[in-house]
């Protein structure tokens, strides 16, 4: 099979999985994305949060520009605390690589009891952030801002 065919097949499979409401893909960032979609009822695309304010997306510095950006800073800080946990500080066990289990029922997020200490901590970081995102207003003027100007 040609690589282009494999990519097409993969795209179809991923689309079908999403359409069938099958549980999220087992990758932490996909889990976080799906938590955000659960909490905000799918009202905003997850990519809208990727380059927002000073803290939503990669890195972060300065003072958060608004409530939503504060949610991202709190999430970043929470992941920083997770990395300090002995259960989370070995290779491929940190917040970006550890897979946890959770439920989304009627837009309510619950981290499951079968998570170990590290997974439970990370799940709660993501859960808290997703709920925070859902409750914070989205200000379009804070998307893709000049970080050198606004985030020092």
From Swiss-Prot:
The EC number(s) this enzyme carries: 3.1.1.4
Pfam family, one: Phospholip_A2_1
Keyword terms of this UniProt record: Calcium, Disulfide bond, Hydrolase, Lipid degradation, Lipid metabolism, Metal-binding, Secreted, Signal
Compartments in which it is found: Secreted
Top-rank taxon, per record: Eukaryota
Presence of keyword Signal: yes
Principal localisation: secreted
Tissue: Expressed by the venom gland.
Catalysis: reaction(s): a 1,2-diacyl-sn-glycero-3-phosphocholine + H2O = a 1-acyl-sn-glycero-3-phosphocholine + a fatty acid + H(+)
Cleaved propeptide residues: 22-27
Positions with a binding annotation for Ca(2+): 55, 57, 59, 76
InterPro entries recorded: PLipase_A2, PLipase_A2_Asp_AS, PLipase_A2_dom, PLipase_A2_dom_sf, PLipase_A2_His_AS
Active site: 75, 126
Family indicated by similarity: Belongs to the phospholipase A2 family. Group I subfamily. D49 sub-subfamily.
Function: PLA2 catalyzes the calcium-dependent hydrolysis of the 2-acyl groups in 3-sn-phosphoglycerides.
PANTHER family given in the database record: PHOSPHOLIPASE A2, PHOSPHOLIPASE A2 FAMILY MEMBER
Entry protein name: Acidic phospholipase A2 57
Source organism of this protein record: Hydrophis hardwickii
């Amino acid at each position: 099979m040609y690589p282009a065919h494999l990519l097409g097949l993969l795209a179809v499979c991923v689309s079908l999985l999403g359409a069938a409401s099958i549980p999220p893909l087992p990758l932490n960032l996909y889990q976080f994305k799906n938590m955000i979609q659960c909490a905000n009822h799918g009202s905003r695309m997850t990519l809208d949060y990727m380059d927002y304010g000073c803290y939503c997306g990669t890195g972060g510095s300065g003072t958060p520009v608004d409530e939503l950006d504060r949610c991202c800073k709190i999430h970043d800080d929470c992941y920083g605390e997770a990395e300090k946990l002995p259960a989370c500080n070995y290779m491929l066990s940190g917040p970006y690589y550890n897979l946890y289990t959770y439920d989304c029922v009627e837009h309510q997020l619950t981290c499951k009891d079968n998570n170990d200490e590290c997974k439970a901590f990370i799940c709660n970081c993501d859960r808290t952030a997703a709920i925070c995102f859902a409750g914070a207003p989205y200000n379009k003027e804070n998307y893709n801002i000049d970080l050198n100007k606004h985030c020092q």
